[in-house]
């Protein structure tokens, strides 16, 4: 698996990964209807803006299998193709995001987690920092100044 920066040619693949990950993994943490609404919310133009304006990294094994978006100190998105889940792709992408956040001078990483991904983030040192928002996303944070689960893990390039 290689990790590389996303570019404009990745937009459709990233949108497809996002949609399939949400529909495959969000239920039963949310209803099928809620998952459908979430999956259709961000179209390819949102992904194009993310690639242009933020750090977006893609995991590739011949084709794109996952991606992560970093906006300042925030992990704005992290999705892995359902056919590649539980193979460490998300962990490598999250480590890459944390490296990017640290390199930008931040000492804390922030994100909003869907209910189905909470355990993934908790196992990697994230803690809740507030109640869920109106859409059910939980605000999480991680101190990047101390060594903890998966910290210091250098992702493949």
Feature map (PLM): residue ranges:
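Conserved GNAT-fold acetyl-CoA-binding loop/helix
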Residues: 19-45
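Conserved GNAT acetyl-CoA-binding A-motif
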Residues: 101-114
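Conserved active-site tyrosine of GNAT-family acetyltransferases
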Residues: 121, 126
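Conserved catalytic-core motifs of GNAT/GCN5-like acyltransferases
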Residues: 110-112, 127-141
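A short beta-loop-alpha structural element at the N-terminal edge
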Residues: 2-16
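A short, internal acetyl-CoA/4′-phosphopantetheine-binding micro-motif in the GNAT/acyltransferase core
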Residues: 75-85
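Conserved beta-hairpin
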Residues: 54-66
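Conserved acetyl-CoA pyrophosphate-binding loop and the N-cap/start of the following alpha-helix
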Residues: 84, 88-96
């Amino acid at each position: 698996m290689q990790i590389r920066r996303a570019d404009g040619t990745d937009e459709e693949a990233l949108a497809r990964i996002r949609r399939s990950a949400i529909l495959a993994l969000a239920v039963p943490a949310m209803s099928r209807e809620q998952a459908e609404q979430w999956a259709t919310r961000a179209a390819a133009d949102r992904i194009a803006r993310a690639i242009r304006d933020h750090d977006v990294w893609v995991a590739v094994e011949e084709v794109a299998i996952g991606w992560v978006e970093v906006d300042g100190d925030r992990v704005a998105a992290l999705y892995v193709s359902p056919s590649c889940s539980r193979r460490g792709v998300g962990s490598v992408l999250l480590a890459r995001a944390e490296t990017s956040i640290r390199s930008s001078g931040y000492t804390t990483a922030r994100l909003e987690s869907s209910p189905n991904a909470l355990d993934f983030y908790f196992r990697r040192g994230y803690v809740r920092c507030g109640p869920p928002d109106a859409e059910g996303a939980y605000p999480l944070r991680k101190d990047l100044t101390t060594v903890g689960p998966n910290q210091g893990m250098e992702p493949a390039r």
